[in-house]
Design a protein with these regions (language model features):
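Non-catalytic scaffold segments within catalytic domains of secreted glycoside hydrolases
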Residues: 1-62, 66-71, 80-417
Length: 417
């Protein structure tokens, strides 16, 4: 292989896959999202139901991930399971997550654990959710109890998944619970609460576990057309909140970068995905099943933004991926994204991981099970796992620390039952 064909990643670099509890575990009946999915008039195309049954199949899935050669697994512990009613903590659920963590260690896979990944306990939402004045203290107490029960098995802890995108999703766009639109006052309260929740939640985790702690942010690569300045579109509001989290991350052990595409903003506002699934699913060479522009190069720009904005806090790429029915396109996307990582490393940026989203084809929130992000398929009836060629390709990268061209893609696949 020539130098143009191979990038060499550093010793100890983590390459793995990411997931979120509500999207793969199944039966998350005490969560706000479970209620949201079953509410009359819900925007969700289908309910999460049993999801991928990861709750009962985690050993199989972690063994599968390790068998590919991947060395890191990001997953979330579900607040709605650990504290299903206010002040009532489930030791059985903490024990369950200890088993998940132990399985990671058994297979020499580093667990990267998120304490809050989008879904809330239903009772928290009933109290006012992210906009409630009580939210930071409730999250702090939960983090203290969860880290107290799990801390000795953690390798990395992420406080909140994409807190920079949650306020607009729930209070401006209405695509997440509680489903309000245009409520800027509630959005601002949620923003302040999430900033404080990260501070106090992170401190609670550190008090219980000697592990690196950070926040993971939603970072599309925003590009303005010539002559166009910042506006107040939801994605720009998110970006301004990202900047505030970057300031907090100066004191953190790492910051997580989660990037899928770029968003170009012109005089008519952001040029992005159509909200209608029937149009989104018409995937083209230039777009994905989410309606996103196919632009893996976005990752290099957002890594550098995070590095610059935090003053040099180490970077974990905690999500990068593509929804596609064409696995060769997935491999090409991952290769291009990894080239951006290699370029950032060459420029002196301290990037420590690349985690692909997602390990499994999973529940993609309001779009249900239609977008296919996974390295592994999951039969909706039998739950049989069907590894894709992309899983083997990424595993080979993890084993060798070399990023070959997609001409070297192994197209073999097998069904695991």
């Amino acid at each position: 292989m020539t130098n143009e064909e191979v990038a060499v990643l550093p010793e100890g670099f983590l390459i793995g896959a990411a997931t979120g509890a509500h999207q793969i575990e199944g039966g998350n009946v005490n969560s706000d999202w479970w209620e949201w999915e079953h509410r009359q008039g819900t925007p969700c195309l289908e309910p999460s139901g049993d999801a991928c049954d990861f709750y009962h199949r985690f050993r199989e899935d972690i063994a599968l991930l390790a068998g590919f050669g991947l060395n890191a697994f990001r997953f979330s512990v579900e607040w709605a399971r650990i504290e299903p009613a206010e002040g009532e903590f489930s030791q059985a659920e903490l024990n369950h997550y200890r088993h998940v963590l132990a399985s990671c260690h058994e297979h020499r896979v580093k667990p990267i654990v998120t304490f809050h990944h989008i879904s809330l306990p239903a009772w928290v939402q009933q109290l006012g959710g992210l906009a409630s004045d009580r939210f930071p203290a409730l999250f702090e107490r939960y983090c203290d109890r969860a880290a107290g029960g799990l801390g000795d098995l953690l390798d990395y802890a992420c406080t909140i998944n994409e807190p920079d995108a949650l306020p607009t999703g729930g209070y401006i766009l209405g695509v997440n619970p509680p489903g309000r639109t245009g409520d800027k006052d509630a959005m601002r309260r949620a923003e302040e609460n999430l900033l404080e929740a990260h501070r106090v939640g992170g401190a609670a985790i550190r008090s219980q576990a000697d592990v690196p702690v950070g926040v993971v942010l939603a970072l599309p690569d925003i590009q303005y057309e010539d002559g166009v300045g910042p506006g107040d579109s939801p994605i720009e509001l998110n970006s301004r909140l990202s900047d505030r989290f970057f300031e907090l991350a100066r004191d953190d052990d790492f910051v997580g970068v989660q990037t899928y595409t770029r968003v170009r903003i012109g005089r008519d506002g952001p040029q992005g995905a159509d909200v209608d699934w029937e149009q989104r699913r018409s995937e083209t060479p230039e777009t994905t099943q989410m309606g996103y522009e196919y632009y893996p190069q976005a990752l290099g720009n957002t890594i550098r933004r995070a590095w610059r904005s935090t003053g040099g806090t180490p970077i974990l790429v905690t999500e990068s991926g593509i929804a596609t029915s064409i696995d060769e396109k997935r491999v090409a996307y991952i290769e291009a994204a990894l080239r951006e990582v290699e370029s950032a490393l060459a420029d002196g940026v301290n990037v420590r991981s690349y985690l692909y989203w997602s390990l499994l084809d999973n529940f993609e929130w309001s779009l249900g099970y239609r977008p296919k992000f996974g390295l592994v398929g999951a039969d909706r009836r039998t739950f049989a796992r069907v590894p894709k060629a992309s899983a083997y390709w990424l595993g080979a990268v993890a084993r060798t620390r070399h990023v070959p061209t997609t001409r070297g893609c192994d197209t073999s696949a097998a069904t695991v039952r």
